[in-house]
Regions:
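Amphipathic alpha-helical substructures
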Residues: 1-84, 145-159
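Sequence context surrounding c-type heme c attachment/ligation sites in exported
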Residues: 50, 67-68, 89-188
C-alpha cells in the first residue's frame, strides 16, 4: 500500500481513529479479557478499513453497506453515527498476524510517513508508550529523517549503522526489537 498523494489516507483517517474506539467498546461490552489489547483473535473494522486488512469475510460477517440499513437517512445525516454503526467485529484466521492494538491500521500509521515504514519511530513509540522505557537523545545529536530504502541502502543497513555506533546503540538496543517486529506490516 503506497499512497504518495495522501488521498486514500485522508479518506481513511476518521476510520483509523475510530477503529481503536470500536475495538475498546467490543472488549468492554462483551466483557472480554484485557489481554485482547495485546493479542486478539478478532478485529473491529468497517468496509473502508477492509481495503487495508483484505480479510475474506464469511457471508454472515459481511460488513454492512450503510445504504442497506433501515434507518439509512438518519445514519447518512449523522457522520459519527454512520461510522459507529458501520464497524463490525470480524474473527481472524489462526494464521493472521493481526489482532490487538499494536497491529491496528491507525496505530501502525501513526509512526510512518504514509510511503514507507519506520521501524525506529514505531519501536521508540512502543518502548516509551507501552513499556514506559526511557529513551534519551544523546546531547548534541540531531535525528535525521529516515530516507526511503533503496536497492543499495536498506532500512536494515541503517539499523546496523545505529547498532554499531556506541552513541546510538544504548537506545536502539531497547527500541529496535519492537520496531523490527512491526516490520511485518506495511504502513498500515
Amino acid at each position: 500500500f503506497r499512497d504518495r498523494g495522501g488521498e486514500k489516507i485522508a479518506k481513511l483517517k476518521p476510520f483509523l481513529v475510530q477503529e481503536s474506539i470500536e475495538f475498546f467498546k467490543v472488549i468492554l461490552n462483551e466483557n472480554l479479557s484485557l489481554l485482547n489489547f495485546i493479542d486478539s483473535d478478532f478485529v473491529v473494522i468497517n468496509r473502508p478499513l477492509n481495503d487495508i486488512y483484505k480479510l475474506e469475510l464469511p457471508e454472515e460477517e459481511e460488513l454492512p453497506n450503510i445504504a442497506d440499513q433501515k434507518d439509512s437517512k438518519l445514519i447518512l445525516n449523522d457522520k459519527k453515527l454512520r461510522r459507529q454503526r458501520a464497524f463490525r467485529k470480524v474473527m481472524l484466521d489462526k494464521e493472521s498476524r493481526r489482532g490487538g492494538l499494536l497491529t491496528q491500521a491507525g496505530i501502525l500509521m501513526m509512526n510512518t510517513n504514509g510511503e514507507f515504514t519506520n521501524p525506529f519511530y514505531r519501536g521508540a513509540w512502543v518502548a516509551q508508550s507501552i513499556y514506559g522505557l526511557e529513551l534519551e537523545l544523546p546531547a548534541n545529536l540531531e535525528v535525521e529523517a529516515l530516507n526511503a530504502p533503496t536497492e543499495t541502502f536498506t532500512i536494515k543497513d541503517t539499523i546496523n549503522e545505529h547498532r554499531n555506533n556506541p552513541i546510538c546503540a544504548s537506545c536502539h538496543s531497547k527500541m529496535d526489537p519492537f520496531g523490527l517486529a512491526m516490520e511485518n506490516f506495511d504502513v498500515f
